[in-house]
Amino acid sequence: MAKRIIYNEQARRALERGIDILAESVAVTLGPKGRNVVLEKKFGAPQIINDGVTIAKEIELEDHIENTGVALIRQAASKTNDAAGDGTTTATVLAHAMVKAGLRNVAAGANAISLKKGIDKASDFLVSKIEELAKPISDSNAIAQCGTIAAGNDEEVGQMIADAMDKVGKEGVISLEEGKSMTTELEVTEGMRFDKGYISPYFATDTERMEAVLDEPYILLTDKKIGLVQDLVPVLEQIARTGKPLLIIAEDIEKEALATLVVNRLRGVLNVAAVKAPGFGDRRKAMLEDMAVLTNGQLITEDAGLKLDNAKLEMLGTARRVTINKDTTTIVAEGNETAVKGRCEQIKKQMDETDSTYDKEKLQERLAKLAGGVAVVKVGAATETEMKDKKLRLEDAINATKAAVEEGIVPGGGTTLTHLASDLQKWANSNLSGEELIGSNIVEASLAAPLMRIAENAGANGAVVAENVKSRPISDGYNAATGDYIDMLAAGIVDPAKVTRSGLQNAASIAGMVLTTECIVADLPEKKEAAPAGGGGMGGDFDY
């Protein structure tokens, strides 16, 4: 396909046009008084949302060159989303401000490479300052504040996420589901839950709710198929003498063995339930080993030289309670704390070593199941459109609170970056010179952009607000919801340091790339050929 090649100023201006379009579409959502954006969908109802990265992903322009500019800024948003899960709009606004200021300098004859060096050095300095400013959070109140701000000032959501974190711990998993009611609810599962239910409904002890509840059961864990009932007889006899229930978790149970278990259960000889092991292949084995650690038992596997027919009672795990329905199994166990901690450390090491996002996700799930538990937030709303918007806000809020726990919090509402401008100026004047200093000045001039946009979206004059904030103490900022200047930390208007840091780093990275662009090679727009004229028909006197 033929290409169009554009050089120098013309190339950078074309990129700038695309960047302007995307930045403006995303920036309208910033702050407590930010508006929504409607996305038209090819199929189904339009989506009304307030989430920067989702809007950025939807924007495609007709002009290929301008579209390249859109793609660059979109990258700043999605990288921030990947790293911190929130702050995508801030990253877009920052990147846009840096590109605008930088292009003016390049047009005036500044060396783009030196400017980029200055931008990178300024960015590194600011990252270290954000780390210094960050206050670690421990209490549930600060977590709730973080969630509230990220969810667009929804206090109920903030409190719900704080409760969930309280219950499942920092390592715990908080997942989102679309609820069936109008209200958003929180459901917390203690212990380990996995997505496999009983093999036969005859194992249910509560026929009304179709649940099997086993109190203080023994747990037999094996990674092989149980084909013959003879394999199970020795261990079943030992358990029958104790009078305790038994849960069998195996790769599969063949019909004959299953029938024997069901008959014993129905006759009241032995309270037993059987479940298929979760996962596949190596992952299944790893999850079974996790369960063995959690229940203080052993995984009966031929790799370790253990066979079912010579399994002893002390090889079996124990739990306080096991609840099984047709889809899930929940084990509430009080395992050996030291062993569980050791296993968690092992999983964390594996997470550090793997490059695959999918593997990381699965390891995080395993870690959560071992360490804390699982909290499920069931999102409720009146319409599907509202549900989707709410779900995206909740996702941001969950990510923001996790980021806050990791790296601490800083004053929110664009305040931190605005105050850091004067620190950057002092540092740059004594450490940089020439065009590198100009590069640092570009970053310094852009730092107030998020605050200015928040103020403008609230109907105030952005430049005036930014100047007022700069003249106040470092934790003071502008509360766009009320129009007052207040102590942001005391008022609970906070941002996770990780979100602020990621947004700044990604914006600086993209700005540097755009400024050092000297040539663009893009596809030529395809000419639509006129449709050929229709044929003369079939001929003859036929009526078609």
Swiss-Prot record:
Record GO terms (molecular function): ATP binding; ATP-dependent protein folding chaperone; isomerase activity; unfolded protein binding
Main location class: cytoplasm
Domain of life: Bacteria
GO biological process: protein refolding
Alphabetic keyword roster: ATP-binding, Chaperone, Cytoplasm, Isomerase, Nucleotide-binding
Annotated family: Belongs to the chaperonin (HSP60) family.
Location within or outside the cell: Cytoplasm
Entry keyword ATP-binding: yes
Reactions accelerated catalytically: ATP + H2O + a folded polypeptide = ADP + phosphate + an unfolded polypeptide
InterPro entries: Chaperonin_Cpn60_CS, Cpn60/GroEL, Cpn60/GroEL/TCP-1, GroEL-like_apical_dom_sf, GROEL-like_equatorial_sf, TCP-1-like_intermed_sf
Species annotation: Prochlorococcus marinus (strain MIT 9313)
Binding residues annotated for ATP, in chain numbering: 29-32, 86-90, 413, 479-481, 495
NCBIfam families linked: GroEL (TIGR02348), PRK00013.1 (NF000592), PRK12849.1 (NF009487), PRK12850.1 (NF009488), PRK12851.1 (NF009489)
E.C. number(s) listed in UniProt: 5.6.1.7
The protein's assembly and partners: Forms a cylinder of 14 subunits composed of two heptameric rings stacked back-to-back. Interacts with the co-chaperonin GroES.
GO CC field: cytoplasm
HAMAP family attached to this UniProt entry: CH60 (MF_00600)
Function: Together with its co-chaperonin GroES, plays an essential role in assisting protein folding. The GroEL-GroES system forms a nano-cage that allows encapsulation of the non-native substrate proteins and provides a physical environment optimized to promote and accelerate protein folding.
Gene that this sequence comes from: groEL2
Catalytic EC class: isomerase
Name of protein: Chaperonin GroEL 2
Pfam assignment, any one: Cpn60_TCP1
Gene3D superfamilies: GroEL, GroEL-like equatorial domain, TCP-1-like chaperonin intermediate domain
